[in-house]
Amino acid sequence: MQRAVSVVARLGFRLQAFPPALCRPLSCAQEVLRRTPLYDFHLAHGGKMVAFAGWSLPVQYRDSHTDSHLHTRQHCSLFDVSHMLQTKILGSDRVKLMESLVVGDIAELRPNQGTLSLFTNEAGGILDDLIVTNTSEGHLYVVSNAGCWEKDLALMQDKVRELQNQGRDVGLEVLDNALLALQGPTAAQVLQAGVADDLRKLPFMTSAVMEVFGVSGCRVTRCGYTGEDGVEISVPVAGAVHLATAILKNPEVKLAGLAARDSLRLEAGLCLYGNDIDEHTTPVEGSLSWTLGKRRRAAMDFPGAKVIVPQLKGRVQRRRVGLMCEGAPMRAHSPILNMEGTKIGTVTSGCPSPSLKKNVAMGYVPCEYSRPGTMLLVEVRRKQQMAVVSKMPFVPTNYYTLK
């Protein structure tokens, strides 16, 4: 999302962390924006709408950005993430297709287990981040970013055609479902009231198809992008408003928008594609080496492996790091300097942390400046201020795992 102007500025939260092409006030939008199945629901609940990645989405509701953020950390919030691209990869060669595009080990995923992975190019750059789930229904369920919708879809469709021309059994289907994210420490408790399945048996990055508050055919995945426990629910369009309404009846739940989602993911040290990672960033530079499957590293059979794998054993020129500072908040594009005042890097995302009451950011610096505790300078509003390289996540994550 952009350093969005007027509408967002009046809300007291500047979406400077988001990529310029993605988010802006509706008054600035020239194209016809797409609407999620919950568009009227958002308006009825006081949603303040902005243009994001070609969609009209709520940046916040009646509560302040800070209140929404803290409510998610302490209770739970409901987010509409229906703008994200949901696809099914079908056929007996579905794993072969996906492993030809991503860095992760898809073949070793158990039924209904998922993983965060990366589309990469032959130069080692990251084309997008995505979640791939090996469903027990015999297909791969893929969720990727709205801002990369056309690029990701074309990438997968081209590979489908290539493999089909080789006689391979593979296909692709775009899902028309809505996608709701219920995030926060009480999310599972809230959802349990509406499902027969025991959510204690659904750990982080696993999923199951179930009826949720009377809506059948929902895929519930224990994941999210806030650092908290939570789920993402892929729901048939016809049941989306009913499901959101049913969840919102619980007093634990409040609606939250793009502003809270961005500050929550930043506190959790999670990347925003287009800002923190892009086609010119490798997984090693982006501190995402953990996404590289062990078998895939050894085989060097993913796009860009000849660039990426040697970086694991050697040194890269720069790394993504966390930063904390007092004073004015660091924003995307703020210059990072060493203590001698020489520019050495750039902030890619930044905001005041409602949880820590400090300013947090992430950015890229040369490896010799990447050790936690290293003191640096950040230029904010033409003034230099002290910043310290900090471990991420900035706040502890609370993902649910089986004991």
Swiss-Prot record:
- Chief place where the protein resides: mitochondrion
Give the disease entry from the UniProt record: Glycine encephalopathy 2: A form of glycine encephalopathy, a metabolic disorder characterized by a high concentration of glycine in the body fluids. Affected individuals typically have severe neurological symptoms, including seizure, lethargy, and muscular hypotonia soon after birth. Most of them die within the neonatal period. Atypical cases have later disease onset and less severely affected psychomotor development.
- Entries under InterPro entries matching the protein: GCS_T, GCST_C, GCV_T_N, GcvT/YgfZ/DmdA, GcvT/YgfZ_C, TrmE/GcvT_dom1
GO MF, one example: transaminase activity
Q: Which Gene3D superfamilies match?
A: Aminomethyltransferase beta-barrel domains, Aminomethyltransferase fragment, Probable tRNA modification gtpase trme, domain 1
Q: Decide whether keyword Chaperone is in the record.
A: no
Q: Which residues form a coiled coil?
A: none
> Transit peptide span?
1-28
Q: What is the name attached to this protein's record?
A: Aminomethyltransferase, mitochondrial
Enzyme Commission numbers on file = 2.1.2.10
Upper classification of the source organism reads: Eukaryota, Metazoa, Chordata, Craniata, Vertebrata
Q: Where in the cell is it found?
A: Mitochondrion
Q: How does it assemble?
A: The glycine cleavage system is composed of four proteins: P, T, L and H.
The answer, when asked if Glycosyltransferase is one of the entry's keywords, is no
Q: Name one GO biological process term.
A: glycine catabolic process
Top EC category: transferase
Which parts of the sequence bind substrate? 232, 261, 399
Lineage: superkingdom: Eukaryota
Instruction: Give the CC-aspect GO terms.
Output: glycine cleavage complex; mitochondrial matrix; mitochondrion; nucleoplasm
Membrane-crossing residue ranges in chain numbering: none
Q: Which family does it belong to?
A: Belongs to the GcvT family.
Ordered alphabetically, the record's keywords are: Aminotransferase, Disease variant, Mitochondrion, Transferase, Transit peptide
Q: What's the stated role of this polypeptide?
A: The glycine cleavage system catalyzes the degradation of glycine.
Q: What is the effect of changing residue 129 to A/N?
A: Loss of aminomethyltransferase activity
| Catalytic activity annotation | N(6)-[(R)-S(8)-aminomethyldihydrolipoyl]-L-lysyl-[protein] + (6S)-5,6,7,8-tetrahydrofolate = N(6)-[(R)-dihydrolipoyl]-L-lysyl-[protein] + (6R)-5,10-methylene-5,6,7,8-tetrahydrofolate + NH4(+)
